[in-house]
Structure formats: C-alpha cells, structure tokens
C-alpha cells in the first residue's frame, strides 16, 4: 500500500489530482503455492482465507477467497441489539509475458457484504435495526508494449459496478427499502519515454464514464450520468543524483 500526496495525475490519471492510494496486489511466483488461514474470536467472529498462486507457461496467476463475519457488539445504552458484519470476497489475477516486448494482465474482484448499524434516531424506543447489503465487482485489464528499452506504451480498461440496498426494518429509521447503484468505465493510454538516465517524458489520455442510479423508497429508479476526458503531459529531469 502506497499513499501519495499532492497531484499524481501524470501517472495515475485525472482522478488522482489531489493524491492517491496505490494498492498493489500480489503476483503469482514461479513455485506453486497454496495458503490457508483461519482465526476466530469473541462475539462470533470468524475469518477464513484460501489462496492459490503460481506460474505456468510465462503466466503468473493468483486466486484467493476470503470470508469474514462477526455477530458484533451493542454500544447502545437502552437495548442489546448487536451490529453484525459479513464480507465475502474473491480475487483473480493473471499476468502473461508473451515476449520481451508484449505483456498482458488482468484482474477480477468480487465482494458481497452485509452490515448492521445504529442510525441516529431521536426516540429512545427505536430498535436501530438498520442494515445494508452491498455487492461490488471490478474487472480490469492492461496491455503493455515495449518496442525498445526506452519507450513503454500501456493501454488499460477498467469496469466496476456497485449496488447498495438499505433494508426496511421495524423500529428502524428506514421504513421502506432503498437501492443505490453505481457503474464506472475507464479507458486510458499512457506512454513513458526515457530520453536518457536524467530526462523522461510521460504522456497520455484517459476517459471515465460514470452512471449512478437510486431508487429511494421504491418510488422508481432515477439515473444520472457524466463523463470526463483528460490528457496529460509530464517532463521530468534529474539535475544531479541528489536533486
């Protein structure tokens, strides 16, 4: 995990104009490897993780599944209602090095969540039975072409979808179910040309398309959409080894 402050648009696109958190997942290694992890704790807490990684025919791969759940605790002074949480996630990742010039990589991530929480309600008799169901998927792919050691070209495509449903429960602050949806598609090209050891150029273009939908109180889905197209150019020069 890498936290970068300040504008990072020249490297990570227009969405990183105020900074970015760069999370790099593990790649498969040459040796076949399988991992199993399980722990448990109080309040019905259980966590299990299974993963498999390796390399075959110049292709690195990683497949993992994780399940976390807990019954939660009650922080309210007038009832014993606990706030449970569940998170099931799947990750698949591959990287294929065709030759010295061409590489392709892809990632698929799925997540299913359930959350109970206490909403601020001004009545002491409320049971605070708020709950949220969430589903999220992300798929991304990238093609990298290096015609020579100085010039690197990268085409990328990312698609994501999120759905959040807030359930209606007796004594809660939500009397009718609410649904919220979000979709994002991102397309981009980035080029990196190293003129020499001290000078380099970074340039590219990116387009992001966002669509949102909400169905509050089941009154009908309302949709909105927008897009952003951006280009960037960055020249970097190293004056000395320390500057």
Regions found by a protein language model. Give the residues of each.
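Periplasmic-side early beta-strands and strand-to-turn transitions of outer-membrane beta-barrels
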Residues: 10, 22, 30, 51-132
């Amino acid at each position: 995990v890498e936290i970068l402050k300040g504008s990072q648009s020249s490297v990570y696109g227009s969405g990183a104009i105020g900074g970015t958190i760069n999370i790099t997942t593990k790649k498969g290694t040459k040796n076949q490897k399988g991992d199993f992890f399980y722990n448990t704790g109080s309040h019905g807490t259980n966590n299990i993780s299974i993963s498999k990684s390796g390399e075959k025919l110049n292709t690195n791969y990683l497949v993992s599944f994780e399940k976390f759940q807990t019954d939660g605790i009650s922080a309210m002074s007038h009832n014993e209602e606990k706030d449970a949480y569940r998170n099931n996630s799947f990750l698949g990742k591959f990287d294929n090095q065709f030759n010295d010039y061409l590489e392709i990589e892809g990632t698929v991530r799925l997540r299913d969540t359930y959350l109970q929480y206490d909403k601020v309600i001004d009545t002491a008799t409320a049971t605070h039975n708020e709950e949220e169901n969430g589903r999220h998927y992300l798929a991304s792919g990238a093609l990298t072409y290096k015609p020579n050691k100085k010039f690197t070209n990268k085409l990328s495509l990312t698609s994501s979808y999120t759905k959040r449903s807030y359930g209606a429960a007796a004594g809660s602050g939500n009397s009718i179910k609410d649904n919220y949806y979000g979709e994002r598609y991102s397309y981009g090209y980035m080029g990196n040309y190293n003129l020499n050891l001290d000078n380099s150029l970074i340039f590219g273009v990116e387009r992001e398309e966002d669509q949102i939908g909400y169905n509050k109180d089941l009154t009908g889905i309302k949709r909105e959409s927008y897009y952003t197209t951006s280009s960037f150019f960055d020249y970097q020069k190293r004056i000395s080894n320390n500057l």
